Design a protein with these regions (language model features):
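Catalytic histidine site
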Residues: 80-129, 215-219, 251-255, 259-260
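Solvent-exposed loop/turn segments at secondary-structure junctions
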Residues: 92-95, 106, 112-115, 136-138, ...
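Chymotrypsin/trypsin-fold serine protease catalytic domain
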Residues: 136, 146, 161-234, 260-266
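Catalytic nucleophile loop of clan PA
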Residues: 229-250
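C-terminal cap/linker of serine protease catalytic domains
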Residues: 247, 251-274
Protein backbone atom coordinates (compact mmCIF):
# COMPACT_ATOMS: atom_id res chain seq x y z
CA UNK A 1 0.00 0.00 0.00
CA UNK A 2 1.64 3.30 0.95
CA UNK A 3 4.96 1.72 0.20
CA UNK A 4 7.82 2.41 -2.15
CA UNK A 5 10.52 0.26 -0.73
CA UNK A 6 13.91 -1.33 -1.03
CA UNK A 7 12.87 -4.98 -0.99
CA UNK A 8 16.11 -6.83 -0.41
CA UNK A 9 18.38 -4.08 -1.70
CA UNK A 10 17.41 -2.95 -5.14
CA UNK A 11 20.42 -0.67 -5.63
CA UNK A 12 22.10 -1.12 -8.99
CA UNK A 13 25.01 0.76 -10.54
CA UNK A 14 25.21 -1.21 -13.76
CA UNK A 15 23.19 -3.72 -15.74
CA UNK A 16 22.38 -6.49 -13.23
CA UNK A 17 22.25 -10.19 -13.89
CA UNK A 18 18.58 -11.02 -14.52
CA UNK A 19 16.81 -12.76 -11.68
CA UNK A 20 15.87 -16.36 -12.28
CA UNK A 21 12.43 -16.07 -13.83
CA UNK A 22 10.25 -17.65 -16.43
CA UNK A 23 7.90 -14.66 -16.66
CA UNK A 24 5.08 -17.20 -16.28
CA UNK A 25 2.52 -15.32 -14.26
CA UNK A 26 0.13 -17.20 -11.97
CA UNK A 27 -2.97 -14.98 -11.78
CA UNK A 28 -5.60 -15.41 -9.08
CA UNK A 29 -8.71 -13.37 -8.32
CA UNK A 30 -10.69 -12.38 -5.23
CA UNK A 31 -14.28 -11.18 -5.17
CA UNK A 32 -14.72 -8.19 -2.87
CA UNK A 33 -17.16 -8.67 0.02
CA UNK A 34 -18.74 -5.24 0.34
CA UNK A 35 -20.53 -6.26 3.53
CA UNK A 36 -17.18 -6.39 5.29
CA UNK A 37 -17.13 -3.32 7.51
CA UNK A 38 -14.53 -4.19 10.14
CA UNK A 39 -10.83 -4.80 9.95
CA UNK A 40 -8.15 -2.94 8.05
CA UNK A 41 -6.50 -3.02 4.68
CA UNK A 42 -3.21 -2.64 6.49
CA UNK A 43 -0.28 -4.76 5.47
CA UNK A 44 2.63 -4.99 7.92
CA UNK A 45 4.69 -3.70 4.99
CA UNK A 46 2.53 -0.63 4.41
CA UNK A 47 2.61 2.91 5.75
CA UNK A 48 -0.32 5.12 6.53
CA UNK A 49 -0.74 8.40 4.68
CA UNK A 50 0.67 10.55 7.47
CA UNK A 51 4.33 9.54 7.52
CA UNK A 52 6.09 11.31 10.37
CA UNK A 53 9.47 9.93 9.37
CA UNK A 54 10.76 7.39 6.87
CA UNK A 55 9.80 4.15 8.59
CA UNK A 56 11.28 0.74 8.05
CA UNK A 57 9.50 -2.55 8.56
CA UNK A 58 11.05 -5.88 7.76
CA UNK A 59 13.79 -4.28 5.66
CA UNK A 60 11.38 -2.19 3.61
CA UNK A 61 12.11 1.54 3.35
CA UNK A 62 9.48 4.06 2.32
CA UNK A 63 11.99 6.84 1.64
CA UNK A 64 12.96 6.79 -2.02
CA UNK A 65 13.72 10.41 -2.80
CA UNK A 66 17.25 10.11 -4.18
CA UNK A 67 19.30 13.23 -3.46
CA UNK A 68 17.49 16.49 -4.21
CA UNK A 69 13.78 16.01 -4.78
CA UNK A 70 13.14 16.29 -8.52
CA UNK A 71 9.38 15.75 -8.44
CA UNK A 72 7.00 18.41 -9.72
CA UNK A 73 3.37 18.80 -8.79
CA UNK A 74 0.77 18.20 -11.49
CA UNK A 75 -1.77 21.00 -11.18
CA UNK A 76 -4.05 20.16 -14.10
CA UNK A 77 -5.18 16.67 -13.14
CA UNK A 78 -8.03 16.64 -15.65
CA UNK A 79 -5.70 16.77 -18.67
CA UNK A 80 -4.54 13.55 -20.33
CA UNK A 81 -2.90 11.36 -19.15
CA UNK A 82 -3.37 12.71 -15.61
CA UNK A 83 -7.10 12.03 -15.42
CA UNK A 84 -6.38 8.32 -15.94
CA UNK A 85 -4.01 8.21 -12.94
CA UNK A 86 -5.71 7.34 -9.66
CA UNK A 87 -5.22 7.55 -5.94
CA UNK A 88 -6.34 4.42 -4.11
CA UNK A 89 -7.46 4.47 -0.47
CA UNK A 90 -7.99 1.53 1.87
CA UNK A 91 -9.43 1.00 5.34
CA UNK A 92 -7.07 2.32 7.98
CA UNK A 93 -5.82 5.33 6.01
CA UNK A 94 -3.50 3.47 3.65
CA UNK A 95 -2.88 4.75 0.14
CA UNK A 96 -1.53 3.64 -3.23
CA UNK A 97 -1.49 4.91 -6.78
CA UNK A 98 -2.54 3.28 -10.02
CA UNK A 99 -3.72 3.85 -13.57
CA UNK A 100 -6.89 3.07 -15.47
CA UNK A 101 -6.24 0.61 -18.31
CA UNK A 102 -9.88 0.24 -19.39
CA UNK A 103 -13.28 1.66 -18.51
CA UNK A 104 -13.42 -0.32 -15.25
CA UNK A 105 -9.91 -1.65 -14.60
CA UNK A 106 -7.02 -0.20 -12.56
CA UNK A 107 -3.44 -1.47 -12.75
CA UNK A 108 -1.45 -1.13 -9.52
CA UNK A 109 1.09 -2.97 -7.36
CA UNK A 110 0.45 -6.43 -5.95
CA UNK A 111 1.21 -5.24 -2.43
CA UNK A 112 -1.63 -2.74 -2.81
CA UNK A 113 -4.21 -5.52 -3.16
CA UNK A 114 -2.68 -8.28 -1.03
CA UNK A 115 -0.23 -8.37 1.86
CA UNK A 116 2.01 -10.87 0.09
CA UNK A 117 4.00 -13.78 1.46
CA UNK A 118 1.19 -15.23 3.56
CA UNK A 119 -0.37 -17.70 1.16
CA UNK A 120 -3.76 -16.70 2.56
CA UNK A 121 -6.84 -15.48 0.74
CA UNK A 122 -7.76 -13.66 3.96
CA UNK A 123 -5.07 -11.04 3.37
CA UNK A 124 -6.59 -9.10 0.50
CA UNK A 125 -7.12 -5.37 1.01
CA UNK A 126 -10.45 -4.03 2.32
CA UNK A 127 -12.37 -0.83 1.83
CA UNK A 128 -10.91 0.03 -1.57
CA UNK A 129 -11.78 3.47 -2.97
CA UNK A 130 -10.38 4.76 -6.27
CA UNK A 131 -10.25 8.45 -7.24
CA UNK A 132 -9.16 9.28 -10.82
CA UNK A 133 -7.43 12.63 -11.33
CA UNK A 134 -7.75 13.58 -7.66
CA UNK A 135 -6.47 17.08 -6.94
CA UNK A 136 -6.17 17.73 -3.22
CA UNK A 137 -9.68 17.71 -1.75
CA UNK A 138 -11.31 17.68 -5.20
CA UNK A 139 -12.37 14.48 -6.97
CA UNK A 140 -13.28 15.74 -10.46
CA UNK A 141 -14.61 12.33 -11.50
CA UNK A 142 -15.90 11.11 -8.15
CA UNK A 143 -14.77 7.82 -6.60
CA UNK A 144 -15.41 4.16 -7.32
CA UNK A 145 -15.29 1.00 -5.24
CA UNK A 146 -13.89 -2.41 -6.11
CA UNK A 147 -15.66 -5.60 -7.14
CA UNK A 148 -12.63 -7.81 -7.69
CA UNK A 149 -8.92 -7.82 -6.79
CA UNK A 150 -6.39 -9.76 -8.85
CA UNK A 151 -2.70 -10.47 -8.35
CA UNK A 152 -0.12 -13.22 -8.81
CA UNK A 153 0.00 -16.41 -6.76
CA UNK A 154 3.76 -15.96 -6.53
CA UNK A 155 3.15 -12.66 -4.72
CA UNK A 156 0.57 -14.20 -2.39
CA UNK A 157 2.75 -17.19 -1.51
CA UNK A 158 6.23 -15.69 -1.20
CA UNK A 159 6.06 -11.93 -1.86
CA UNK A 160 8.12 -12.54 -5.01
CA UNK A 161 8.98 -9.02 -6.14
CA UNK A 162 8.93 -10.11 -9.78
CA UNK A 163 5.22 -10.75 -9.30
CA UNK A 164 4.32 -7.50 -7.51
CA UNK A 165 1.45 -6.49 -9.79
CA UNK A 166 -2.22 -6.06 -9.01
CA UNK A 167 -5.49 -5.31 -10.75
CA UNK A 168 -8.63 -3.71 -9.32
CA UNK A 169 -11.93 -4.21 -11.11
CA UNK A 170 -14.22 -1.28 -10.37
CA UNK A 171 -17.92 -0.99 -9.64
CA UNK A 172 -18.15 1.80 -12.22
CA UNK A 173 -17.06 2.54 -15.78
CA UNK A 174 -15.36 5.87 -15.07
CA UNK A 175 -12.76 5.16 -17.75
CA UNK A 176 -15.39 5.96 -20.36
CA UNK A 177 -15.17 9.54 -19.07
CA UNK A 178 -11.46 9.81 -18.26
CA UNK A 179 -9.98 7.55 -20.89
CA UNK A 180 -7.20 5.17 -19.95
CA UNK A 181 -3.55 4.39 -20.56
CA UNK A 182 -2.25 1.73 -22.90
CA UNK A 183 0.49 -0.70 -21.87
CA UNK A 184 3.12 -2.63 -23.76
CA UNK A 185 4.84 -5.91 -23.01
CA UNK A 186 8.28 -6.56 -24.45
CA UNK A 187 11.33 -8.69 -23.76
CA UNK A 188 13.69 -6.09 -25.24
CA UNK A 189 15.93 -4.07 -22.95
CA UNK A 190 14.36 -0.83 -21.76
CA UNK A 191 17.67 0.57 -20.52
CA UNK A 192 18.01 4.20 -21.59
CA UNK A 193 14.30 4.63 -22.29
CA UNK A 194 12.85 7.94 -21.09
CA UNK A 195 10.06 7.24 -18.60
CA UNK A 196 7.79 9.08 -16.18
CA UNK A 197 6.58 7.98 -12.74
CA UNK A 198 3.41 9.85 -11.75
CA UNK A 199 1.24 9.27 -8.70
CA UNK A 200 0.26 10.30 -5.19
CA UNK A 201 3.15 10.32 -2.67
CA UNK A 202 2.44 10.33 1.05
CA UNK A 203 5.08 12.95 1.88
CA UNK A 204 3.17 15.64 -0.02
CA UNK A 205 -0.22 17.22 0.69
CA UNK A 206 -2.93 14.57 0.60
CA UNK A 207 -4.44 13.99 -2.81
CA UNK A 208 -1.82 15.92 -4.76
CA UNK A 209 -0.30 14.34 -7.86
CA UNK A 210 3.46 14.47 -8.39
CA UNK A 211 5.69 13.42 -11.26
CA UNK A 212 9.28 12.96 -12.38
CA UNK A 213 10.79 11.97 -15.73
CA UNK A 214 14.15 10.30 -16.25
CA UNK A 215 15.85 7.33 -17.86
CA UNK A 216 15.42 3.67 -17.04
CA UNK A 217 18.88 2.70 -15.83
CA UNK A 218 18.76 -1.08 -16.03
CA UNK A 219 16.47 -3.92 -16.99
CA UNK A 220 15.81 -7.40 -15.65
CA UNK A 221 13.41 -10.02 -16.94
CA UNK A 222 10.53 -8.78 -14.80
CA UNK A 223 11.93 -5.56 -13.26
CA UNK A 224 13.19 -2.15 -14.31
CA UNK A 225 15.33 0.26 -12.24
CA UNK A 226 15.46 4.06 -12.29
CA UNK A 227 16.33 7.06 -10.15
CA UNK A 228 13.12 9.05 -10.52
CA UNK A 229 12.09 10.21 -7.05
CA UNK A 230 9.08 8.60 -5.37
CA UNK A 231 7.68 8.09 -1.89
CA UNK A 232 5.33 5.84 0.03
CA UNK A 233 1.89 6.14 -1.54
CA UNK A 234 3.24 6.04 -5.09
CA UNK A 235 3.27 2.26 -5.08
CA UNK A 236 1.29 1.14 -8.10
CA UNK A 237 1.94 4.34 -10.04
CA UNK A 238 2.40 3.87 -13.77
CA UNK A 239 5.90 4.02 -15.23
CA UNK A 240 5.17 5.16 -18.77
CA UNK A 241 7.15 6.18 -21.84
CA UNK A 242 6.99 9.27 -24.05
CA UNK A 243 3.97 7.79 -25.84
CA UNK A 244 2.09 7.56 -22.52
CA UNK A 245 2.33 3.76 -22.72
CA UNK A 246 2.86 1.92 -19.43
CA UNK A 247 6.03 -0.20 -19.41
CA UNK A 248 6.18 -0.95 -15.66
CA UNK A 249 4.39 -0.53 -12.32
CA UNK A 250 6.26 1.38 -9.62
CA UNK A 251 6.75 -0.84 -6.57
CA UNK A 252 9.99 -0.29 -4.66
CA UNK A 253 12.40 2.37 -3.52
CA UNK A 254 15.91 2.73 -2.22
CA UNK A 255 19.17 4.00 -3.68
CA UNK A 256 17.54 2.99 -6.96
CA UNK A 257 13.78 2.80 -7.41
CA UNK A 258 12.21 -0.05 -9.31
CA UNK A 259 9.03 -1.39 -10.80
CA UNK A 260 7.46 -4.58 -12.00
CA UNK A 261 7.89 -4.78 -15.74
CA UNK A 262 5.02 -5.34 -18.18
CA UNK A 263 6.12 -8.55 -19.86
CA UNK A 264 4.33 -9.97 -22.91
CA UNK A 265 2.74 -12.60 -20.67
CA UNK A 266 1.46 -10.02 -18.20
CA UNK A 267 0.26 -7.77 -21.03
CA UNK A 268 -1.73 -10.63 -22.52
CA UNK A 269 -3.30 -11.37 -19.15
CA UNK A 270 -4.23 -7.73 -18.58
CA UNK A 271 -5.91 -7.66 -21.97
CA UNK A 272 -7.94 -10.74 -21.04
CA UNK A 273 -9.33 -9.23 -17.82
CA UNK A 274 -9.70 -5.54 -18.54
Amino acid sequence: MALTSSLGGAAVASEPTPLASTSDIQPVSHTVDKSQVSGSAASPLADKYVIAAPSKTGGFSTDSVIGADGRVRIINTTAAPNRSIVQIEFNGGYICSGALISDDTVLTAGHCVHEGGTGSTADYSWGVKVAPGRNGSTDPYGTCGATQLLTDQRWIDSANTNADWGVIKLDCTIGNTTGWLNYSGTTASLTGTSATVRGYPGDKAFGTMWSMTGAIESTQTEKVFYKMDTYGGQSGAPVYNSSNTIVAIHTNGGSSNSGTRITPTLANYLTSVK
